[in-house]
């Protein structure tokens, strides 16, 4: 599939789907039909629903297997350690929902209330929602086309009764697909704080992260920063660090310097992280002295600082 062209006339333009730059665009037929110009009424409904959510953070990755969902889960765990902070974790990886397993909530079900779907609560201040809670078995495959995935995301954002929330963390699938376009479209009016992008040190991962950064720029999604996962290996016996995935091109640090993107931190590979996820436990609690935990906590603090500097919806910087 080709990328949306840089000089796209926009769905509202008279040239939508007909201009020279529209040739080869995957959305050409949709734009030409005029359907793309009609505002989705769900956007306003979601905006109203999200008024009780202070901060909204998307967690992205260019590739699968780089630890994106693990990071999302531990970001939620870390923020929720403050009992006065209300945290919500939304899993929109529709075809690969791993959050229920990582959070120790496999087998839980979603209940309907008068005010919408009730999230599954791990703690009084940590609610979770995932398509995994809607499956009869964790082994069931979700084989859906884009429109059905988009409809599910719309329901999660509009129909879940999150209540008063300080942080909504959205765990997305890898890449830049329908799910990403949908969540950005639905949440933009509700003020997204930004995206955290997860990578590993190898160039094969960084290549896709650059595409993810390009996606963020195109849809005007602020980038909170990049996290380099699996950045060195901590031996559980001697606690010494060695390189499993050498940063052949300088890793995330060099890429961030080149693109002027904040590097939030580097999380070393600790085998206990995987064990904690398999058990559905917080690694931050199980291994508080691990260098990986220290890195996680530093990154979480930087994300909190970023969000605290974001202006409330409707306010603008002087002179902007």
Swiss-Prot record:
Residue numbers carrying N-acetylmethionine: 1
Record GO biological process: cell projection organization; iron-sulfur cluster assembly
GO CC terms of this entry: centriole; cilium; cytosol; nucleus
Alphabetical keyword list: 4Fe-4S, Acetylation, ATP-binding, Cell projection, Cilium, Cilium biogenesis/degradation, Cytoplasm, Cytoskeleton, Iron, Iron-sulfur, Metal-binding, Nucleotide-binding, Nucleus
Obligatory cofactor(s): [4Fe-4S] cluster
Binding site for [4Fe-4S] cluster 1: 8, 22, 25, 31
InterPro entries: Mrp-like_CS, Mrp/NBP35_ATP-bd, NUBP1/Nbp35, P-loop_NTPase, YlxH/NBP35
Pfam family membership, one: ParA
The record's free-text note on cofactor binding: Binds 4 [4Fe-4S] clusters per heterotetramer. Contains two stable clusters in the N-termini of NUBP1 and two labile, bridging clusters between subunits of the NUBP1-NUBP2 heterotetramer.
GO molecular function: 4 iron, 4 sulfur cluster binding; ATP binding; ATP-dependent FeS chaperone activity; iron-sulfur cluster binding; metal ion binding
Annotated [4Fe-4S] cluster 2 binding sites: 235, 238
Sites where the protein binds ATP: 62-69
Subcellular location: Cytoplasm; Nucleus; Cell projection; Cytoplasm, Cytoskeleton, Cilium axoneme
Biological function: Component of the cytosolic iron-sulfur (Fe/S) protein assembly (CIA) machinery. Required for maturation of extramitochondrial Fe-S proteins. The NUBP1-NUBP2 heterotetramer forms a Fe-S scaffold complex, mediating the de novo assembly of an Fe-S cluster and its transfer to target apoproteins. Implicated in the regulation of centrosome duplication. Negatively regulates cilium formation and structure.
Subunit structure: Heterotetramer of 2 NUBP1 and 2 NUBP2 chains. Interacts with KIFC1. Interacts with the BBS/CCT complex subunit CCT1.
Protein family: Belongs to the Mrp/NBP35 ATP-binding proteins family. NUBP1/NBP35 subfamily.
The protein's name: Cytosolic Fe-S cluster assembly factor NUBP1
Organism: Bos taurus (Bovine)
Taxonomic classification: Eukaryota, Metazoa, Chordata, Craniata, Vertebrata
């Amino acid at each position: 599939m080709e990328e949306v062209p840089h000089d796209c006339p926009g769905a509202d333009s008279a040239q939508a789907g007909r201009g020279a730059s529209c040739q080869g665009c995957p959305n050409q037929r949709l734009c030409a039909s005029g359907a793309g110009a009609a505002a989705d009424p769900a956007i306003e409904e979601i905006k109203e629903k999200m008024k009780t959510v202070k901060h909204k953070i998307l967690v992205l990755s260019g590739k699968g297997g780089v630890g994106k969902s693990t990071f999302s889960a531990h970001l939620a765990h870390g923020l929720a350690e403050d009992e006065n902070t209300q945290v919500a974790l939304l899993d929109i990886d529709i075809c690969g929902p791993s959050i229920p397993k990582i959070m120790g909530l496999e087998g839980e079900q979603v209940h309907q209330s008068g005010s919408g779907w009730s999230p599954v609560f791990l703690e009084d201040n940590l609610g979770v929602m995932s398509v995994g809670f809607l499956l009869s078995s964790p082994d069931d495959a979700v084989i859906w086309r884009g429109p059905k995935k988009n409809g599910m995301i719309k329901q999660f954002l509009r129909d879940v009764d999150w209540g008063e929330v300080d942080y909504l963390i959205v765990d997305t699938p890898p890449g830049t697909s329908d799910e990403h376009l949908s969540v950005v479209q639905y949440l933009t009016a509700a003020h997204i704080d930004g995206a955290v992008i997860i990578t590993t040190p190898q160039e094969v991962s960084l290549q896709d992260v650059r595409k993810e950064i390009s996606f963020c720029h195109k849809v005007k999604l602020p980038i909170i920063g990049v996290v380099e996962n699996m950045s060195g290996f901590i031996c559980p016996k001697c606690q010494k660090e060695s390189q499993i995935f050498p940063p052949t091109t300088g890793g995330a640090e060099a890429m961030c310097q080149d693109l002027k993107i904040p590097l939030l931190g580097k999380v070393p590979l600790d085998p206990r992280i995987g064990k904690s996820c398999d058990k559905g436990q917080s690694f931050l609690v199980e291994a508080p002295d691990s260098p990986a935990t220290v890195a996680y906590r530093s990154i979480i603090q930087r994300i909190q600082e970023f969000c605290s500097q974001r202006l409330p919806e409707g306010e603008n910087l002087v002179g902007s």
